[in-house]
Amino acid sequence: MDIIGRAKKELAEYVAAQLGISEEEVFKNITYPPREELGDLSLALPSLIKGNINEKAKLLQEYKGELIERIEVAGIYLNARLNLRNIFVSIFSKLDDSYGLEKIEKPKRIVVEHTSANPIHPLHIGHLRNTILGDALARALKARGHSVNVRFYVNDTGRQVAVLIYGLKLLGFPDPEPNVKKDLWLGIIYAMTNVILEIRKLREELKKLSESEYREKVRELDELIVIANDLRNRNEVLFDKLADAINAKEEPEKEIGEIIKKYEEGNDELKGIIRKYISYALEGFSETLSKLNIRFDNFDYESDLLWENMVNEVLKALLSSSAKIPYKGVIALDLDSFLGDEARSKLRIPKGLKIPPLVLMRSDGTTLYTVRDIAYTIFKFNQFNADFVINVIAEEQYIPQIQLRGALELLGYSRFAENLLHYSYGMVNIQGLRMSGRLGKIITIDEIYEKLDNIVRNKLKEKGGNMENIDDIANAALRYAILSVSANKPLSFDLNRITSFEQNSGPYLQYTYARAANILAKSTENLSMDKVDFSDLVGDKRNILILIAKFPEVFKNAVDNLRLEDLVAFLRELSDIFNSWYDKERVLQEQDPRKRMLRLYIVKGVSVVLKNGLSVLGIRSLERM
C-alpha cells in the first residue's frame, strides 16, 4: 500500500494529460521540495517542457484529485499539496502489521555470502561490519519478497589453517581447554605458532643481510619479540612447548607445505583432524554470532571445491584460454586486453581501469584463491539456482572482485559475471580499542559485545530500566552504528555514544517505539475513523503522517538500491519528530475525544512503522525499556 506512490501517479497522470507527454516521464521527475512550505511533491518544469514554460504552465493551474489537494506553479516549479484527510483514511483504514513492507512484483533468488572469516581465531573487529551488513542485507531482501540464501565460505585449505594444524600437531593434537571458548583457544595456538615461525624465519634472514637491511629487519624482529612475550605471558607452558618443538625442527615450512598438499589431495587422516578443529572454530563463531541473532543457511568448505574437482575444471578451462599469458615466471590471464568497452560496461568496470594480470598458479603448481573463488561463484549460482550473488567483502578486494567477474565472462558465464555483486565496505574503528600487531593481539567481537553489555547495564540501572533487555539493546546499538553509515565510507564510533537513549542510536529508536507502545497499551479506546478530528492534522502531526505515508517508498528504495542507511535515516527522522511532538502535546490526557482519537492513530502508525523498520535491520522492538 504505497500511498505516496499512488499520489505521485495521480499527479503524473494529470500533468502528462495536460502537457501531452508520457506519464512515466513525469513520474520519474517528481521529487520532494526542500522546504515544507513549498508543498509535498514537486516537479521541475524545464525537465518536461521545451520552449515557453509560462505558456504551458497555465494549463497546470487548477487541479484537485483524490490524494492531491491542490497544485500551484511557482517560477519553474510545479508544487503539489497532498489531501491529508484522504491520505490518513487510505493508510489507517487498511493499516496492519505488515504495513510498508512492500513485496516486489518479480522476486529473485539471491545468495548473500558474508563474514567468511578464516577459522583460525575468534571473529574480531575487522569482521564486525561485514557480518552485520551481510545479515541486514539478507533480512531486507527477504522482507522485500526475494528468496534469499545466506552462506559462509570456510577457507580451510590455506597456509593459515596449515600453520594452526602444525602447532596443534606439535602439541599432540590436544582437546580444547574446558573453560576457554574454542575459537579463542585455537586463536592463541595459531598466534603463538605463527609468531615463533616468523621470529625463526627473520633470524635466518638476518644472517644474510647488509648492514642497512639488517637494521630495518632488527626493528621488525624487536616488534615480533614484544608480541611473542605478550603471548607467552598468556600461557607460558603452551608457548614454551611450541617454541621448543618448532626450533628443534630443521624445516618447519616444508612440513607446513606438506600439510597443505596432503589436505588438498584429500588425505583421509588429515581430513578428519582438520575438519574436527575447524568445527571447533565454527562452533565459536556461531556462539558469537548468536548474540547478534545472525544465522547461516550453508557453510561451504573450500576443500570440497578441490576434492570434487571443481577448481581443477575451472583451472583447465582458464589454461586453455586465449587470454593466457606468461607473467613473472607464472601463468596469468590478461583480462585487461580481453575485456572490451561493452563487457566493461556490463560488468561495472571503469572504462580506463588497468586490470592487473590474474595469476592462476604459484610456481609450485598450487592455485591461488581467486581461481577457487571462480569455482565457488559458479557453485553458488548453480547450487541455489540464483539470479544474483552478493559478496559482502571489504573494499581492499575491489580488484580481485573485478578479476573474478572478468574471468567468469571469459569462461562464458556471462550471466553470472553480470549478476555477481560486490557489496564493498570501508574499515571500522571503535574509539579506544586498537588492533595491535598482525600476529598476536586482536579485539574480538565477544570483547566488544561484553563492553557494550556493561555500558548498557549501567545505563539501565541509572534509569531503572528492564534488565532483561540488555542483549537486545546492545545488539541494536551495534547494528545502528554500522548500518547508519554508507558501507563504502570509513566508520568510527564510540561505545558510550552509540548506547545513547536520547538521540541518534539504536537504543533511541527502541526507546521511541517503547514510548509509542506504552501510550497504546494505556489507552482503553478502540480506534474509530468516525471519531477523528481531521482539523487537528497540523504541525508535527501533519509531518508525522506524511512520513508514515512515505515509509513503503523508503523501504522499497532502500532495499532495491542496497542502501539500508537511507532506511536508518528515515527511522531516525520519524523518531525525532515523534518525540518532539509528544514532548509538546499530550495524547491520552487530551480532553477533546476527537483530537485524542486522531493522535492515537498517529501513535499507532509510528509504532507500526518503527517495528517493521527495525525488524528489517535485525533490531528487536521493545515494548518496555
Curated annotation (Swiss-Prot):
<dbReference type="InterPro" id="IPR035684">
    <property type="entry name" value="ArgRS_core"/>
</dbReference>
<dbReference type="InterPro" id="IPR036695">
    <property type="entry name" value="Arg-tRNA-synth_N_sf"/>
</dbReference>
<keyword id="KW-0963">Cytoplasm</keyword>
<dbReference type="InterPro" id="IPR014729">
    <property type="entry name" value="Rossmann-like_a/b/a_fold"/>
</dbReference>
<keyword id="KW-0030">Aminoacyl-tRNA synthetase</keyword>
<dbReference type="GO" id="GO:0005737">
    <property type="term" value="C:cytoplasm"/>
</dbReference>
<feature type="short sequence motif" description="'HIGH' region">
    <location>
        <begin position="117"/>
        <end position="127"/>
    </location>
</feature>
<dbReference type="GO" id="GO:0004814">
    <property type="term" value="F:arginine-tRNA ligase activity"/>
</dbReference>
<keyword id="KW-0648">Protein biosynthesis</keyword>
<protein>
    <recommendedName>
        <fullName>Arginine--tRNA ligase</fullName>
        <ecNumber>6.1.1.19</ecNumber>
    </recommendedName>
</protein>
<dbReference type="InterPro" id="IPR005148">
    <property type="entry name" value="Arg-tRNA-synth_N"/>
</dbReference>
<dbReference type="Pfam" id="PF00750">
    <property type="entry name" value="tRNA-synt_1d"/>
</dbReference>
<keyword id="KW-0547">Nucleotide-binding</keyword>
<keyword id="KW-0436">Ligase</keyword>
<dbReference type="Pfam" id="PF05746">
    <property type="entry name" value="DALR_1"/>
</dbReference>
<comment type="similarity">
    <text>Belongs to the class-I aminoacyl-tRNA synthetase family.</text>
</comment>
<dbReference type="GO" id="GO:0006420">
    <property type="term" value="P:arginyl-tRNA aminoacylation"/>
</dbReference>
<keyword id="KW-0067">ATP-binding</keyword>
<dbReference type="InterPro" id="IPR008909">
    <property type="entry name" value="DALR_anticod-bd"/>
</dbReference>
<dbReference type="GO" id="GO:0005524">
    <property type="term" value="F:ATP binding"/>
</dbReference>
<dbReference type="InterPro" id="IPR009080">
    <property type="entry name" value="tRNAsynth_Ia_anticodon-bd"/>
</dbReference>
<dbReference type="InterPro" id="IPR001278">
    <property type="entry name" value="Arg-tRNA-ligase"/>
</dbReference>
